[in-house]
């Protein structure tokens, strides 16, 4: 079956998927969780093949970290699925109800987007999260994973599809494509695909946007910042910065740049640098930073770089305004944090930083659908339309207007025979 034939079949199955009951969709999730638990060994064998090939190909350690899908990660996605089951049904929610006239009622209800195409990177857990979120939200999904995870993705997809179909999910609501050239074919399916979600670099997202007529929800790279203000708790700052940089480096919500107020730098940087050394973090600093701690030179390009590694760029600033300007210029509008004890400074930062997530006194690693209580996420949207930040269930639904009348015609209202009352219900 070609990609176009897949997409066409999905479009036809989409209304059936949208009309599936809450019970059917939740049962599918439970069946998937059970199947993943029972077939861990099969998944790990497939993943080991991918890891061996990736090492032979000389892929970076950050890619290998993302690619690894061991028992711990499988247990993590199973827990995520079970948590997703407990969340409310995002479909058929009444968002607005208004009586336009005594026998003319307008209702706005949530409904699935339809057919979603997701192009994602080398993380196998992304396939599980995306497919289960789409099932829960009544969407059909066509998946294209990174070639590095081909064996793992194939094993996971077959397990997920078999389990979902066994409890009544339409077989044509889930498809996986593997070939690189399938991306171009998917981009041409604007008649059948309602939304594309590419996960990758800014360049990749821009390429997708420029080569398709399908609406795109962009998941960009993560050049996340922390600004350490002149008024702060030093111990708290060190704890937050170390977690943001080192808790897991190969992800888009890890901090890549640290901005430090010049007045607090002499007290903070030596203490922080010691903690960085203990975690094997390579520090790149501007000249004024190098005057306080021993580190490598930071270039202009470093402040535009998503390292996904144990590397951080450090710069001194003279005010919160300078920090904000730097973030808005060099950041990717993903997640940025201020560490401060001054409420007014924090409010200024929260108001003027133009990012999907703006944090105060907490790790940037919290930028995640699961940690927001969304169950999981299909990605982080840095755009401003429809969904922004971690895209969970609510970001995968749209709405429709239901208007119920009793022989009402517009001419009666134009000619004054009847009038609207616009009463909220």
Predicted region positions:
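A structural signal for short, well-ordered beta-strand elements
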Residues: 18-19, 230, 316, 339
